[in-house]
Curated annotation (Swiss-Prot):
A UniProt-annotated Pfam family: MDM1
Keywords: Coiled coil, Cytoplasm, Cytoskeleton, Microtubule, Nucleus, Repeat
Protein name, UniProt field: Nuclear protein MDM1
Compositionally biased residues, Low complexity: 461-475
Sequence motif ST]-E-Y-X(3)-F motif 3, location on chain: 259-265
Length: 691
């Protein structure tokens, strides 16, 4: 047999577990409850139950007049009168229906006697005994086989009932009898479950305790009489004793047990922060409780800061975003877009993630850009072949300064600006030749017809397209097509009216300002045809040398966190329409486009003349309102830079680059896809609100 260590270990000495004694009450706690009703325990009001109490039903055939009252003294006149009337009624009913009468099997229990005395338990038992002695069954018909209860069994029942009451008063465990009545409504509905069998040691202790209790109960009657006399002399003392006799609670509170968890993990209210360390509040040390509310406030502040840090970390990791952005990233149309990122840093990423990441610009593609800029001759020759294959006019357009994508270096932008300045100096030398050629071509034409012809042909020319496209490619939202822009107002779509410009939404609305240039353009209709070249050059200057363009683009790139409301920095245009005819001018556009495409040298010289003031070319007034031409940016003028072109075309920065971008954008499915692509190209550094 192995020897087990039965001593107290260090853990048991320091930390005590709750013993099961608290769950099972001891005999001292159970003895005052035994055999007492709720009114004796100090409960003067029973609980309200929702359901009706089920009262046992007795057959009302036999009245109380059949109860034997011969042994009792009929001192009460009311009872005797009631008994006489009941007997007379019973005799009459027996005479009429003797065959239908039935006799009870045994004596019924009397109604519950409620008394507020402390020893009413004994009284109920005695009353039961007396009533059972008084009751004798009536004469049974001869055909009934059931025998009556003998007087010996009656006496045994009385003795058992008295002994049972004494046992319950003494605190002994007495089994519940089905015939014994419940003392209160609560006990009748909520009965204690039968306890488990006790061990022999507990049974022996209970026997010893019960013998002591029986000795206390069986006191002589003299002590009881003396106590009654003293209560009659001093009634106040009786009330005090009755009030002081409160039942012991079933679970006595011995204080909180010092468990291991409670000793190690205390609430933050029991600590205070001092000199960079947390220390526990001691009850003996003064001036510590005053700092307790401040410490709790500090604790709540720490929790709030941790919650904020978690939110910021989720934003950086990309797990905190708007569902609108997720809808754009997981769109099926992403497969139609050009993959613009093949850098070495993303070689380990799967193809699906690389297809979703549309903001990348490869280092391999941007590196040969300076070399391509040093070869203008070969570039022009190769691009002319491309334009002839595509069926477009080979007339070059105005050079446009490209906006920086996040992956490009600032040095390339500086080289672009220097290249533009050199080209514009060459344009100044050819300005006079352009004006003379235009005057010779238009000498024999009437002035009114000349204005109308210029209006119809120039909007479709590559120069006009490049001019309007260059203005439309502002850092903000989309400007209308060249035809709609001549009208002074773009026809709005549901995208223009509902979507904001920042925060992952589509940028489709034009700026709301009415520039002085547009007013001068309306006044200068019918002026000298040399204004065509001036307008194109002025548009290129405004596009390439605008000082506030870069700042505005930076402000739009910094989008707020997802889920927050945004303000549209580019409101809708509020210009007015100019009602004019449509039918004749639309036919003239196609003929004028073929006419101008056959004379590329003349139009090429129009872009080379810078002028000090803005002199726009004559425009079509009030035309192209037909829904056939309202494609929301598909006709020649979606926003510039919305697509990443192939490597050859993206490295250009002159008129060939402009024409290739126009041809690529004309193949786009809609303006919505192009704007989403541009939004995705700017998101890697600035999409999550990083500064």
């Amino acid at each position: 047999m192995p020897v087990r260590f039965r001593g107290l270990s260090e853990y048991k000495r320091n930390f005590r577990w709750k013993t099961p004694e608290l769950c099972s009450p001891s005999q001292e706690q159970k003895s005052p409850w035994a055999g007492l009703r709720s009114d004796q325990l100090g409960i003067t009001r029973e609980p309200n139950f929702i359901s009706k109490r089920r009262v046992p039903y007795h057959n009302p055939q036999i009245s109380k007049s059949f109860e034997w009252t011969g042994d009792c003294d009929s001192d009460d006149p009311v009872e005797t009168e009631a008994l006489k009337t009941a007997e007379s009624l019973a005799e009459h009913s027996n005479d009429v229906n003797q065959e239908n009468t039935e006799t009870p099997e045994g004596p019924r229990l009397p109604p519950k006697v409620r008394s507020h005395s402390s020893d009413s338990g004994v009284e109920t038992a005695l009353a039961l005994a007396g009533n059972s002695m008084k009751k004798t069954p009536p004469v049974a018909p001869p055909n009934q086989k059931e025998a009556f209860v003998s007087p010996k069994k009656e006496a045994e029942k009385v003795n058992n009932g008295l002994h049972r009451v004494l046992q319950r008063k003494g605190g002994m465990n007495t089994p519940h009898l089905s015939t014994f009545p419940r003392n209160s409504e609560y006990q009748s509905q909520f009965v204690w479950k039968s306890p488990h069998e006790k061990s022999p040691i507990l049974a022996a202790e209970e026997a010893l305790y019960n013998t002591k209790r029986e000795e206390l109960i069986q006191k002589p009657a003299e002590d009881a009489s003396k106590q009654e006399k003293s209560e009659q002399k001093h009634p106040k003392r009786k009330n005090k004793q009755h009030i002081s006799q409160k039942p012991l609670s079933l679970h006595t509170h011995r204080g909180k047990m010092n468990t291991e968890y409670r000793s190690k993990f205390l609430s933050p209210a029991q600590y205070f922060y001092k000199d960079g360390a947390w220390s526990r509040i001691r009850s003996k040390v003064p001036n510590q409780a005053s700092q307790n509310p401040l410490n709790s406030m500090w604790y709540m502040e720490v929790r709030e800061l941790r919650a904020r840090a978690k939110a910021y970390r989720q934003r950086i990791e990309g797990t905190h975003f708007s569902r609108y952005h997720l809808n754009q990233l997981l769109s099926d149309n992403n497969s139609l877009w050009d993959v613009s990122s093949n850098s070495s840093s993303e070689e380990g990423i799967s193809n699906d993630i690389r297809a979703l990441d549309l903001a990348g610009v490869s280092e391999k593609e941007t590196a040969p850009r300076p070399k391509m800029l040093q070869q203008p001759g070969s570039r022009e020759q190769s691009h002319q072949d491309d334009t002839e294959k595509k069926g477009l006019s080979d007339a070059p357009t105005v050079p446009v300064k490209r906006r920086l994508v996040w992956g490009e270096q600032e040095g390339t932008a500086e080289k672009d600006s220097q290249q533009l300045r050199e080209e514009e100096e060459k344009e100044n030398e050819q300005a006079a030749v352009v004006t003379q050629n235009l005057e010779k071509n238009n000498e024999g034409i009437n002035e009114d017809n000349r204005i109308e012809g210029e209006n119809t042909c120039l909007p479709n020319s590559p120069a006009a397209v490049s001019e309007s496209s260059s203005v439309s490619s502002e850092p903000g939202g989309r400007l209308p097509t060249p035809k709609l822009r001549a009208l002074g107002r773009a026809q709005r779509t549901h995208h223009d009216l509902t979507t904001p410009a920042v925060g992952g939404a589509v940028l489709v609305s034009p700026p709301k300002f009415k520039s002085s240039t547009s007013q001068q353009r309306m006044r200068s209709l019918g002026t000298d045809p040399s204004s065509v070249g001036q307008g194109a050059r002025e548009a290129s200057q405004r596009r390439s040398f605008r000082p506030g363009a870069k700042l505005k683009a930076v402000s739009l790139l910094t989008s707020p966190p997802a889920g927050l409301g945004t303000v549209d920095p580019l409101p809708l245009r509020q210009d007015q329409w100019h009602p004019n005819g449509v039918s004749g001018e639309t036919v003239a556009i196609n003929s004028a486009y073929q006419e101008r495409s056959s004379t590329p040298p003349v139009l090429k010289s129009t872009k080379n003349r810078p002028m000090p003031c803005w002199s726009p070319s004559p425009r079509i007034q009030g035309t192209l309102k037909d829904p056939e031409f309202q494609h929301n940016g598909n006709v020649g003028n979606p926003k510039m830079g919305s697509f990443q072109l192939p490597l050859q075309e993206r490295n250009y920065n002159n008129e060939d680059d402009r024409l290739s971008q126009i041809s690529a954008r004309s193949a786009a499915s809609s303006s919505l896809a192009s704007q989403i692509l541009e939004r995705a190209q700017k998101r890697k550094e600035d999409f999550w609100g990083k500064t």
